[in-house]
Regions:
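A generic secondary-structure signal for well-formed alpha-helical elements
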Residues: 43-49, 61, 99, 107, ...
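Conserved catalytic neighborhood of penicillin-recognizing serine enzymes
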Residues: 48-112, 174-192
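Mid-domain, small-residue-enriched loop/turn segments at the edges of structured enzyme/sensor domains
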Residues: 68-76, 108-149
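Structural recognition of the beta-strand scaffold that forms the well-ordered cores
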Residues: 3-7, 30, 52-55, 90, ...
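Extracytoplasmic/secreted proteins, especially bacterial periplasmic and envelope-associated proteins
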Residues: 37, 49, 87, 98-102, ...
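A penicillin-recognizing enzyme superfamily signal
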Residues: 3-6, 12-25, 33, 142-192
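Solvent-exposed loop/turn segments at secondary-structure junctions
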Residues: 2-3, 10-14, 28, 59-62, ...
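Active-site SXXK
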Residues: 1, 28-56, 91, 152-156
Length: 192
């Protein structure tokens, strides 16, 4: 969770307590959400493996399956076609939208939403984000900060363990008295 470096803008420092684009600005994260809400959870719940074959095909989602008051959603791939049967590994490498949506269908959007909100501590989610487009393809209502996104991805390099991102360990005065100390608590969020 320790931030080794952060760049919050492209000019020199202009003052103290100014806006930091990496930690203060939220942005749409798009396909970077797929590994952390669809694929890792599909693997964790034994629904898929890297070699599972899923058909890259047209998927039709009705976001309101009870009253049918909303229009159907038909996600598209970047290449505007379908590749047929592909492995999950290929779907990750090529960032195939329709496969990520199908894995999210297997999981249920609430599983992905709860994992982001409670296990990865993403605090910008809204109730509207508990839906297919935000959870499978990253079209979150408020987006995420780069620091939160990097914090979510750290589980892959830390053996399934995540620590809330932090930028200091302790602050001392000129006499060596500890004024502020960061106590970090690593949490296992996925199996290793």
């Amino acid at each position: 969770g320790a931030l080794k470096g952060i760049v919050g803008g492209n000019r020199g420092k202009e003052g103290n307590r100014i806006w930091n684009r990496a930690s203060d600005t939220t942005r749409q994260i798009g396909s970077t959400i797929k590994p952390i809400t669809s694929y890792v959870l599909g693997i964790e719940k034994d629904l898929i493996t890297y070699s599972t074959v899923i058909e890259d095909r047209q998927v039709v989602i009705n976001p309101d399956e009870v009253s049918y008051s909303q229009p159907l959603w038909v996600p598209k791939n970047e290449y505007n076609s379908f590749k047929g049967f592909v492995t999950v590994r290929t779907a990750v490498i090529r960032s195939i939208n329709t496969v990520a949506v199908q894995v999210t269908q297997m999981l249920g959007t609430t599983t992905s939403y709860d994992f982001l909100k409670y296990s990865l501590n993403v605090d910008t989610l809204t109730a509207a984000d508990d839906s297919y487009s935000p959870m499978a393809l990253g079209s979150l209502s408020k987006g995420m900060t780069l620091v939160k996104l990097a914090g979510a991805y750290q589980m892959f390099g830390n053996g399934g363990v995540r620590t809330e991102p932090y930028s200091y360990t302790r602050v001392e005065d000129t006499y060596g008295n500890v004024i502020l100390e960061k106590n970090t608590v690593p949490v296992r969020v996925i199996s290793a």
